[in-house]
């Protein structure tokens, strides 16, 4: 049976995911495919390039850099997370992304974004970690209201989390059968309807289908989490999630809080490492 690693978004809650991934890298845990949404895509690419420690390193180092994430960046560029800094200067110069290792890794890597024209999810299979792949990763993490939409491959895209919390359903639809799922909220979390009605109305003027998708986002999220839970009960999935809500804001500027979220993920992965190995080994035998 083909295995897939599934990564939820959640902005800086993604440091939990980074902790899990680095334990996987340290212990040679591998999958046939991996997929991420939003922060799950932005940080998950380091699992494919096998760069253990990179994501927590640069996030702690630059979390207070206004070019990385700041209201000033939002006012100046239209992006809360500075696009040029995050997707060019950082991976090309400041903390180089290993594109060669990414391209040579046989694990397939998928990222999901939301099509502004339809309000539906669209997915991209990355190839070499180059400019096109990074444009899709940026699109996957382009949060509405605080990011420009990304135009790529005939689409105008925003954050994948508008539609899909994780790529679980998509990966299942293309033939993957066993899943390790990394969530960034505790099990049983129920998403409530967003109170940002005014922002949705403003968005409706430019992207009416996105506004419609946001209006039912909580329903889609909760239904997806239920499907994942049922898959776990059926023995088709194994879920890692924080035991308690993570003490990090979406745009967290405290490096110690980022480290604690990372350490929480690493501890969860170490505790479940034998169970994960057994689950993946069983998948090879089925």
What are these regions (language model features)?
Residues 1-37, 45-286:
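Patatin-like phospholipase
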């Amino acid at each position: 049976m083909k295995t897939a690693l599934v990564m939820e978004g959640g902005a800086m809650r993604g440091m939990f995911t980074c902790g899990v991934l680095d334990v996987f890298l340290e212990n040679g845990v591998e999958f046939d495919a991996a997929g991420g949404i939003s922060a799950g895509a932005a940080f998950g690419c380091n699992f494919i390039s096998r760069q253990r420690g990179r994501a927590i390193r640069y996030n702690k180092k630059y979390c207070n850099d206004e070019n990385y994430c700041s209201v000033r960046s939002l006012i100046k560029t239209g992006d809360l997370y500075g696009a040029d800094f995050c997707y060019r200067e950082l991976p090309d110069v400041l903390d180089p992304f290993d594109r060669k290792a990414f391209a040579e890794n046989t694990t397939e890597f998928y990222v999901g974004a939301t099509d502004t024209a339809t309000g539906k999810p669209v997915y991209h299979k990355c190839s070499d970690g180059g400019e096109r792949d990074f444009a899709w990763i940026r699109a996957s993490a382009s949060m509405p209201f605080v990011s420009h939409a990304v135009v790529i491959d005939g689409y105008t895209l925003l954050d994948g989390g508008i539609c899909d919390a994780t790529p679980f359903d998509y990966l299942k639809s293309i033939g993957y059968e066993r899943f390790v799922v990394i969530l960034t909220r505790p099990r049983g979390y129920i998403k409530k309807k967003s109170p940002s009605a005014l922002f949705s109305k403003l968005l409706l003027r430019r992207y009416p289908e996105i506004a419609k998708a946001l209006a039912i986002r909580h329903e889609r999220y909760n239904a997806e989490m239920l499907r994942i839970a049922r898959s776990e009960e059926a023995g088709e999935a194994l879920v890692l999630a924080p035991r308690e809500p993570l003490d990090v804001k979406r745009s967290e500027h405290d490096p110690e809080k980022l480290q604690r979220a990372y350490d929480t993920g690493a501890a969860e992965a170490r505790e479940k490492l034998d169970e994960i190995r057994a689950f993946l080994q069983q998948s090879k035998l089925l």
